[in-house]
């Protein structure tokens, strides 16, 4: 997987997903926690609750802004976050480079920030996606899908248009709320049979010790997908930085931690 949402399950990437884990979205949602719509979002732009019947969120391009400066998921172009950890087997090393580019992608009429997310292991490429994010006027960060770069003969090749929202039944969802509150539960992305990720806000994640530095206050979320029963994934976020740590709560042994933040 990659740091954004879980890699969308197309035939071209299924083999890669068997080993790659990084900061992907298809993690885990909490067990039977209370839900509400995206905090601060109007009824017209709130995604459906992760519980109950699915209803696609109406998207109004006029309700989106050009920047992504949500405190818990700031995406400043030129910033690269680097993570180290292990893959699903708990042994194989991996490095994830989460690079916020200056590129833009139009999806469903919304101008999205493009993030290049690359996973390597022992110096060899494993997976690369280009993920699309946009922030609404209320401060919620939305996920609009991704492109996957084909891995062939040990090198990244052509792009595979593997999951833009608004096509083939795929719908966007939230990556981070403007005002996360304990018990909130929402869809990250909804594409039946390919990506059906949900997030639940667990509350404070407490103190974390990382190679990059230690943080006293963190936000803890948990993700899951019906496409991966039994797999639960937790993420720790820090204001002003974004995701700093991810670890499997059940189903696998994946783990990844922030080691550096650079700006250029």
Where are these regions (language model features)?
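Hydrophobic helical h-region of N-terminal Sec-dependent signal peptides
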Residues: 13-19
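C-terminal motif of bacterial Sec signal peptides marking the signal peptidase cleavage site
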Residues: 22-25
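Bacterial N-terminal signal peptides that target proteins for export
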Residues: 2-13
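Short, conserved catalytic or interaction motifs in soluble domains
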Residues: 28
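Conserved functional acidic sites
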Residues: 34-264
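Absolute N-terminal positional cue centered near the fourth residue
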Residues: 4-5, 20, 36
């Amino acid at each position: 997987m990659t740091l954004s949402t879980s890699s969308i399950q197309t035939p071209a990437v299924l083999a890669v997903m068997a080993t790659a884990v990084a900061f992907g979205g298809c993690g885990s949602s909490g067990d039977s926690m209370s839900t509400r719509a995206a905090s601060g979002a109007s009824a017209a732009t709130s995604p459906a609750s992760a519980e109950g019947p699915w209803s696609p969120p109406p998207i109004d391009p006029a309700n989106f802004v050009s920047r992504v400066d949500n405190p818990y998921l700031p995406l400043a172009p030129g910033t690269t976050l680097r993570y180290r950890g292990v893959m699903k087997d708990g042994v194989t090393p991996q490095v994830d480079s989460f690079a916020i580019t200056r590129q833009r992608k139009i999806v469903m009429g919304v101008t999205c920030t493009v993030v290049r997310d690359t996973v390597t292991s022992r110096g060899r490429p494993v997976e690369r996606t280009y993920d699309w994010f946009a922030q609404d006027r209320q401060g919620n960060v939305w996920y609009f899908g991704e492109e996957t770069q084909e891995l062939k003969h040990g090198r990244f090749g052509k792009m595979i248009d593997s999951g833009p929202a608004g096509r083939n039944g795929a719908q966007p969802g939230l990556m981070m709320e403007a005002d996360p509150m304990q018990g909130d539960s929402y869809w990250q992305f909804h594409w039946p049979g390919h990506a059906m990720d949900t997030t639940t806000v667990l509350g404070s994640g407490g103190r974390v010790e990382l190679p990059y530095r230690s943080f006293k206050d963190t936000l803890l979320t948990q993700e899951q997908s019906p496409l991966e029963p039994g797999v639960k994934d937790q993420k720790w976020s820090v204001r002003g930085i974004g995701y700093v740590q991810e670890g499997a709560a059940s189903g696998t042994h994946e783990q990844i931690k922030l080691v550096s933040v650079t700006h250029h």
